[in-house]
Amino acid sequence: MKVLLLTGLGALFFAYYWDDNFDPASLHGARVLLTGVSAGIGEELAYHYARLGSHLVLTAHTEALLQQVVGNCRKLGAPKVFYIAADMASPEVPERVVQFALDKLGGLDYLVLNHLGAAPAGTRVRSSQSTRWLMQMNFLSYVQLTSSALPSLTDSKGSLVVVSSLLGRVPTSFSSPYSAAKFALDSFFSSLRRELDVQEVNVAITMCVLGLRDRASAAEGVRGITRVRAAPGPKAALAVIRGGATRASGVFYPWRFHLLCLLRSWMPHSRAWFVRQELNITTPAAA
């Protein structure tokens, strides 16, 4: 019965995501501030936006990698590409990044929040200092960027696109500080969506629930802990862009993650079984 139910739900979700009315032309000339572009999905997001003719402000921590991505975006046809190297772990940086984007582009149509600070998996207890760093990188900087960009997005009736993780919806083992930051993201932006709706502010918020990032740092952080394979960067990035352009409230990639999130409430025992299958439980957690 469970298999039939999951199969039926899967077919419905596939049909839903297949017909999303995505119009690539809608992104031509769009003003986009994109964070975390030095590798993985962030880099692929930059390349997709460049091909679609968007005006870009790109940011990442490592300037040398950032410059390479900027050069590639120009080759792919982006009309305007600016960049600013920034460490989102510094509380004063997010506001400066948004102001730079506003100065260069004259406003924003999309704020795409993709940067992350990863922590090694398998650690039961982390120091308060490292946990504060994780919260600044993965939550507080998102709030700061949003707060600074919201007036411009309100003027343009734009969109907030938040790239998050399954760990912000479904708790799992060996990820407590990182998962806490991602749960905070989901709660903050879900509440903000309601506030904007009540105030009749036409700014869309798209929460993107992705799996393991297709980048070396993400894979290294969970080495020996999980059996999950990294999501292909180009495909995951396109799913994020489609969701943002169509003002969808949520994007799940791979799509089965939507089922897993539903199982959390509907079938908690089944959810726990699915999560357990993704773990290499023979690996002891670090002290």
UniProtKB/Swiss-Prot annotation:
Protein residues bound to NADP(+): 36-62, 87-88, 114-116, 178-182, 211-217
Catalytic activity line of the entry: cortisone + NADPH + H(+) = cortisol + NADP(+)
Enzyme kind, highest EC tier: oxidoreductase
Annotated substrate binding sites: S165
Keyword annotations of the record: Glycoprotein, NADP, Oxidoreductase, Secreted, Signal
Covalent S-S links between cysteines: none
Keyword hit for ATP-binding: no
UniProt-recorded name of the protein: Hydroxysteroid 11-beta-dehydrogenase 1-like protein
Organism: Bos taurus (Bovine)
